[in-house]
Amino acid sequence: MLTAEDKKLITQLWEKVAGHQDDFGNEALQRMFVTYPQTKTYFPHFDLHPGSEQVRGHGKKVAAALGNAVKSLDNISQALSELSNLHAYNLRVDPVNFKLLAQCFQVVLAAHLGKDYTPDMHAAFDKFLSAVAAVLAEKYR
């Protein structure tokens, strides 16, 4: 459960990310593919090389979904319902991969924001990404 303070920090963080979210989404995916190569199996039709337009496009979608969730912090489940259906019923992505991507997104934020990514902000965004991962996995049950 996100507290009022968590929500405030998440919103502040996303304001810092504004203008870079597509690049951060792309970088998080690239990092995931390198760090967890087994995740590539879900993208057999993608060119997964660095700089790939397909990965960049998917990174943009990831960032847009996170932005949508940030705008709907009081109802993340409703905001991501269609995405949850897509990943559970059509794509059949193993839910552990949502956590792997979340971890990679955290690393990208820390690398780019440095001291502006405070420990409190990190903790709040970690809770947020855990909530997003849980919502994306809820249709699997």
UniProtKB/Swiss-Prot annotation:
A GO cellular component entry from the record: hemoglobin complex
KW Cytoplasm (keyword) present: no
Chain's role: Involved in oxygen transport from the lung to the various peripheral tissues.
Gene that this polypeptide is encoded by: HBAD
Tissues expressing this chain: Red blood cells.
Record carries keyword Transport: yes
Name by which UniProt lists this protein: Hemoglobin subunit alpha-D
Organism: Aythya fuligula (Tufted duck)
Entry keywords, A to Z: Heme, Iron, Metal-binding, Oxygen transport, Transport
Coiled-coil features, chain-numbered ranges: none
Family statement drawn from the similarity comment of this UniProt entry: Belongs to the globin family.
Subunit structure, interactors included: Heterotetramer of two alpha-D chains and two beta chains.
Domain Globin residue range list: 1-141
Chain positions recorded as heme b binding sites: H58, H87
